Amino acid sequence: MKEFDYSKLKDRTWDNEILTYVAQIHEYKGKQELYMQQKPVELKRLIEIAKIQSTESSNEIEGIVTTNARLKQLVEDKTTPRNRDEEEILGYRNVLNIVHESYDAIPIRSNYILQLHGELLKYTAFSYAGKYKNTPNEIDMVLESGEKIVLFKPLEPYETPDAVECLCNEFEKAIDEKIVNPLILIPNFILDFLCIHPFNDGNGRMSRLITLLLMYRSGYFVGQYISMEKAIADTKEAYYAALQKADQNWYEGENDPKPFIKYMLGIVLSCYRDLEKRIMLTEKSGKKSTAYDIVKAYTAGTIGRFSKKDALVSCPSLGSSSIEAALKKLVEEGAIIRTGAGRKTMYMKKTD
């Protein structure tokens, strides 16, 4: 049976890049607590935006898609699913809500992971929802010649239940005994989870939901306000490259998890920086600022083209109509240029 022993992490040497990531994220964690006290309105708006982006991005990575309008309706519980993709999207939204609202009541145990998987596929007809895999699930790649090569071979179905149980026990023990910083431990757990590949379907989505769960339980809440799933989707190639480097010789216990740890810490840090940028924009505009002032300050800091949706995400204190009116005024004043029409409308700063 594959065994896990996180006590060995205590004796490992972590390079300066990882230690710098950890130190910077820890500093942002302190700012996060200040934001939660002083910026509740802006953060509430960011939560709603992040939910939509997280649900969209995590599913899109797996090729599960719907229209923007349908996605928003599904996330806001204003419609019912029309097809299998929408059934899976709705399931993700439900688990995301559970993690957001009850993270402190969800221990890292095998039976809870199974329950979350059951919720993920709750609206589908899949018979394996909430159950560990019953068939092998090699990770393959098909070459242009048509030849199929095996990139990674996860654990066999019969090994999976005990492996997940052991993995969860080791994680909880490492957290309780403070063996290593949670920011280093969490990516290790997620890497091992992905290498086990415990389900017939939904492993990637479950790994991202569990990442949020573990981060929240350790006091890092940036994923509530800035979509970590979107950050991963935007760097998908780097994600898979880091995973492939980190899973080499995993079964023998001789793999090097550092590439995946660095990638995940980079994602967390980028999300914290994004959060700070959005909060600072509201502070820079001032309490008496109008929607026009806030949007103008946002556009001044943009590089290249941006959409109304981008402005809405970056100005969490404003509604859609306020942003639209501000953009219209800025176009009329010649401060920004509008291109395209309808859904393809884009804006950019007017250069000298």
For every predicted segment, state its role:
Residues 1-352:
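FIC/Doc superfamily catalytic core
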